[in-house]
Design a protein with these regions (language model features):
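A nucleotide-sugar donor-handling region in carbohydrate enzymes
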Residues: 129-204, 225-226
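Leloir-type glycosyltransferase catalytic cores
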Residues: 150-161, 165-168, 296-342
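A short, glycine/small-residue-rich beta-strand->loop->alpha-helix junction that serves as a flexible
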Residues: 6-20
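Donor-nucleotide binding loops and adjacent catalytic segments primarily
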Residues: 181-253
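Conserved nucleotide-sugar donor-binding subdomain of glycosyltransferases
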Residues: 66-98, 105-106
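Conserved nucleotide-sugar phosphate-binding/catalytic loop shared by glycosyltransferases and other
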Residues: 6-10, 29-79
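A donor-sugar binding/catalytic signature common to diverse glycosyltransferases
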Residues: 98-102, 120, 247-286
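Catalytic binding pocket for nucleotide-activated donors in carbohydrate/polymer assembly enzymes
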Residues: 267-315
Length: 342
């Protein structure tokens, strides 16, 4: 049995759910998490955790708040020396066999200072560590995203990138691609059939969502705004893991942002997606662009573009046919690679 310290960015559930899924695959080893925000919730599942500050992305009004994100990053970098000193003491006491980072800043730096092996497992490095044509109109957005990834989050020795799309890697000796890492809960469900569209648009306003969907012929099941009365064709539901997965597995399609976790789960169940990327969130835009390029759905750059939703819904059967028979489950292969690296 090995001891693994697993650093996780705690500003969104995507990082944490992927890390917990990987930890579940490595259950014969001792896993100790490190991070801030949502990471501390792992204690409820019986894991130990080390508290760390976050260099997270801050969202406001449905878009990345660049100035607030930069201010938070600068504040934590000014405290970096003290944070790293405390973390080194923790690692020296634990003496881990491996350090893993899912887009966490401090753990790979402390590992390097102590001469500990460190690997990265995330989706974000598909942005910087693979080769692809920049989507039209996104050069500045790509640059603004790539710089912090390279400067702040690329200190591991090796990168295991989880992704539903697979462009060529830039450095085959250090970078490997795997299929999506799925949470355990979706794997307990099987895909069904239905006519509704599941809607989860983090950061969008209720007004914008209702203006887009109200009065259309199709029925929409909407999460993220709490439970409400809804309209003739729109049902608003309260947050529920089981309820969400039930509605996902029986949906005809999904309308969501470009987050990799929900895209991967949707594709696992054969559900096409119409993507509305969060503003100035290049990783989400890139995901959505590949969704469209691969024929798995449509990229909808503005929530007001009703004509794109019209086209998407008309082509749901064709998009579903493109997804049929494909695998979007890379948990076992990625875990086997980690075992080989121990």
């Amino acid at each position: 049995m090995a001891r693994i310290v697993y650093g996780v960015m705690g500003d969104s559930r995507g990082h944490l759910s992927r890390s917990l899924a990987v930890a579940g695959e490595l259950s014969r080893h001792e896993i100790i998490f490190a991070g801030g925000g949502l990471v501390e919730t792992v204690r409820q599942q019986g894991y130990r955790s080390i508290s760390l500050p976050m260099l997270g992305t801050i969202l406001r009004n449905g878009a990345v708040d660049t100035m607030a994100t930069l201010a938070n990053t600068a504040r934590e970098l000014l405290r970096r020396r003290a944070t790293l000193a405390a973390l080194r003491r923790e690692l020296e006491a634990l003496r881990p066999d491996l350090v893993v980072t899912d887009y966490e800043y401090f753990t790979p730096l402390a590992a390097r200072q102590l001469g500990l092996p460190c690997i990265s497992i995330d989706h974000q490095h598909v942005v910087t560590h693979t080769r692809y044509e920049t989507p039209p109109g996104q050069r500045w957005n790509r640059l603004c995203t790539s710089l912090p990834i390279r400067l702040l989050f690329s200190n591991a020795e090796r990168f295991l990138v989880s992704s539903f799309f697979a462009p060529p890697v830039a450095e085959p000796a250090r970078v490997e691609l795997f299929g999506p890492v799925l949470r355990p809960q979706p794997l307990q469900y099987t895909a069904g059939t239905g006519e509704h569209v599941l809607v989860y648009l983090r950061g969008a306003s209720l007004k914008a969502v209702t203006e887009l969907l109200d009065g259309r012929e199709r029925r929409y099941v909407i999460y993220g705004f709490g439970e409400g009365r809804g309209t003739a064709n729109c049902a608003f539901k309260k947050a529920s893991v089981d309820g969400f997965l039930e509605d996902l597995t029986t949906a005809a399609a999904v309308l969501s942002n470009g987050g990799h976790s929900l895209l991967s789960e949707s594709f696992h169940f054969g559900k096409p997606v119409c993507c509305v990327p969060t503003g100035m969130f290049y990783e989400q835009y890139l995901n959505a662009w590949f969704v469209e390029q691969l024929g798995y759905g449509r990229l909808m750059p503005d929530i007001a573009r009703r004509e794109i939703l019209d086209d998407f819904e008309a082509r749901i059967p064709a998009f579903a046919a493109n997804l049929a028979g494909k695998s979007f489950h890379g948990n076992a292969a990625l875990a086997a690679r980690v075992e080989a690296l121990l």
